[in-house]
Amino acid sequence: MEYIKKIALYMSVLLLIIFIGGCGNMKDEQKKEEQTNKTDSKEEQIKKSFAKTLDMYPIKNLEDLYDKEGYRDGEFKKGDKGMWTIYTDFAKSNKADELSNEGMVLYLDRNTRTAKGHYFVKTFYEKDKFPDRKKYKVEMKNNKIILLDKVEDPKLKKRIENFKFFGQYANLKELKNYNNGDVSINENVPSYDAKFKMSNKDENVKQLRSRYNIPTDKAPVLKMHIDGNLKGSSVGYKKLEIDFSKGEKSDLSVIDSLNFQPAKVDEDER
């Protein structure tokens, strides 16, 4: 009988050790899973925040934005229908110390159903030289860009009048399929960044290569940046960048943004 008791006690202790060890392993696995879920959930939150506007792409007729409302908060005055700001530029380093930046910004006022903005050409220099900046006023009527300023260069004039925003031909409804992004967060601002590797087979990449001079076969990186609350903020902004750059000293990228804010009355604020 005493022998059987010893065997039973031994088995009980052995089972207890196995159980405690198993619980410890389960806790470790749970911690790992929770940590993974935190990273994944933040990545998903960033993508979902962008999807609120990117799901509208492609916006072939920009005047459709007059009938679309974005995120509203306390910054909006009573009766203000808000304003969409759409922006696209192409940045390219021509030399080691020179960067050219060309694109357009358009402000679509939902109150007046009018769209005004400007086309810009900028050149930045690293050395002791001020940047060159030129702006050409434009407006949009019947989904057509109308140049308001006189432009002597016929090639530039054609680029302005035929300009298309990235949001007019891009299709990012499959954004959820971009996975394993590199996510960074600054809770103090707050700001959120996510990077995803793209493929040259991506239709959006093919579109950009057909529209811009991109002298590299390197597959780009999709960079997503948010300033402000992930749920939405009229004082924050979202920016999308498709980066073809080959190295740290090389700049080659397309930047796109579509944001909704209170309508601005003062033209100087733009």
From Swiss-Prot:
It comes from Staphylococcus aureus (strain MSSA476). It is a lipid-anchor. Keywords: Cell membrane, Lipoprotein, Membrane, Palmitate, Signal. InterPro entries: Csa, Csa_sf. GO terms for cellular component: plasma membrane. PROSITE patterns: PROKAR_LIPOPROTEIN. A lipid is attached at residue 23 (S-diacylglycerol cysteine). Residues 1-22 form the signal peptide. Pfam families: DUF576. It comes from the Bacteria. This is Uncharacterized lipoprotein SAS0403. Gene3D superfamilies: 2.50.20.40. It is found in: Cell membrane. Transmembrane segments: none annotated. Belongs to the staphylococcal tandem lipoprotein family. Its main location: membrane. A lipid is attached at residue 23 (N-palmitoyl cysteine).
